[in-house]
Structure formats: structure tokens, C-alpha cells
UniProtKB/Swiss-Prot annotation:
Keyword Membrane on entry: no
Catalytic site: 79 (proton acceptor)
Official protein name in the record: Nucleoside triphosphate pyrophosphatase
The EC number(s) this enzyme carries: 3.6.1.9
Taxonomic source organism: Legionella pneumophila subsp. pneumophila (strain Philadelphia 1 / ATCC 33152 / DSM 7513)
Location of this chain's protein in the cell: Cytoplasm
Family: Belongs to the Maf family.
PANTHER family for this protein: BIFUNCTIONAL DTTP/UTP PYROPHOSPHATASE/METHYLTRANSFERASE PROTEIN-RELATED, BIFUNCTIONAL DTTP_UTP PYROPHOSPHATASE_METHYLTRANSFERASE PROTEIN-RELATED
Highest taxon of source: Bacteria
CDD domains: Maf
Essential cofactor(s): a divalent metal cation
HAMAP family for this protein: Maf
């Protein structure tokens, strides 16, 4: 960490390489300790709640899970929901599901909802959500197949990697890139300063 910033111990409770890169861009020192919670089981149990509430709940559960083992650290956790017509598009995990997701989203508007929280000693200190709205071009079968072969975005909600070639799939985007990628940086920076986790 540079001399410009003074900080308390921080953990990012995420296995996402993109969130890791976004955090690194802030110049912070932090540990990466992914949560062991079962996201799919939690989503099934909370399938009747509002989608934003579901995202916040998932972020909180991840942070609280890690906080039990690291009480001295401030835990940052996040969750990302890709939503169209009140349906959540989870990580496709395989090629055929990714094809299906892009077919369904083709030519339509959908939302990427980024949910964040900060926890210390199993207490929730801050929570936040931000939404980006994206509209895909009408995608041909050939385009879908070629894109998926190029990036294999099977671990990405919505079956695209916006940080890479995925940008070419869209005709309109409203919202910040870091929100689309799952870690809205300015709200997080302000929260860390306000909570005195980071000083300048």
C-alpha cells in the first residue's frame, strides 16, 4: 500500500478475479477469503423476496460467514444479480445454458444489480446496491456461438464478460462499468472513508 493511504485490515470475501482487480485498483492491501456459503441453496430459500433484498442477503451471509473467522478484519462482500422480467439469470456454468441465456436476453433490456456490504466482528456496518441497465443487440445464432467460443463466460451472470469482448454485444448501457462488473467503487470508497477503515 502507498504512503498516501492508511488502512485497517481488510478482507475481500469473493473468489471473483474481476472484483479482486477492481479492489487492487484502489491501492489497498487486502486478503482474499471466499465464503463457503451455498449460494444456490440460499437463493432457493429466499425465492419469494424482492430481488435487491436477495442480493443484499447473499452479500451479508458471505461477509458474516468470513467475519466469524477473522474478527479483526473489515470484511467486504458482494453479490451480483442479472435480472430480466423478474427472472434471475444465474451463472450458466456450461455452454448450452449460456446459449439459452443469450437467446433469451437477445434484443432485450436487463439489469445487473450489484449488492455490497461491510462487516466487522459479525456486525453489518454498511450495505448498498446499485443497478445498471443494459440492452443487447439482436444476436444471431452464429454471433452467440462465436462469442461463447471466444470467451467461455460460463462463470458470469448473463453469460457474458463485459470487461472483455462482451461489450460488443450491447447497443445501450446505463450505469457504471464497475457496477456491471459487480463492485461499485465510488460508493465503496466513500463507505471505507466514512467508517474510518481507510484514511487519507
Amino acid at each position: 500500500m502507498s504512503k498516501f493511504l492508511q488502512q485497517k485490515p481488510i478482507i475481500l470475501a469473493s473468489s471473483s478475479t474481476i472484483r479482486h482487480k477492481l479492489m487492487k485498483s484502489l491501492g489497498l492491501d487486502f486478503l482474499v477469503v471466499p465464503s463457503n456459503c451455498n449460494e444456490e441453496e440460499i437463493k432457493t430459500r429466499h425465492n419469494s423476496v424482492e430481488l435487491v433484498e436477495l442480493g443484499i442477503t447473499l452479500a451479508k451471509i458471505k461477509a458474516l460467514d468470513v467475519s466469524q473467522h477473522y474478527p479483526e478484519h473489515y470484511i467486504i462482500a458482494a453479490d451480483q444479480l442479472c435480472v430480466a422480467d423478474k427472472r434471475v439469470f444465474n451463472k450458466p456454468l456450461n455452454h448450452q445454458t449460456a446459449v439459452s441465456h443469450l437467446r433469451e436476453l437477445s434484443g432485450k433490456q436487463h439489469q445487473q444489480i450489484a449488492c455490497l456490504c461491510i462487516v466487522k466482528e459479525s456486525k453489518i456496518l454498511w450495505q448498498y446496491h446499485e443497478t445498471a441497465t443494459l440492452t443487447l443487440h439482436h444476436l444471431s445464432e452464429k454471433t452467440i456461438e462465436a462469442y461463447l467460443q471466444a470467451e467461455k463466460p460460463y462463470q458470469s451472470c448473463g453469460a457474458y464478460q463485459y470487461e472483455g469482448l462482451g461489450k460488443w454485444l450491447f447497443k445501450e448501457v446505463q450505469g457504471s462499468e464497475d457496477t456491471i462488473l459487480g463492485l461499485p467503487l465510488m460508493p465503496l470508497v466513500n463507505a471505507l472513508v466514512n467508517l474510518k477503515v481507510v484514511g487519507i
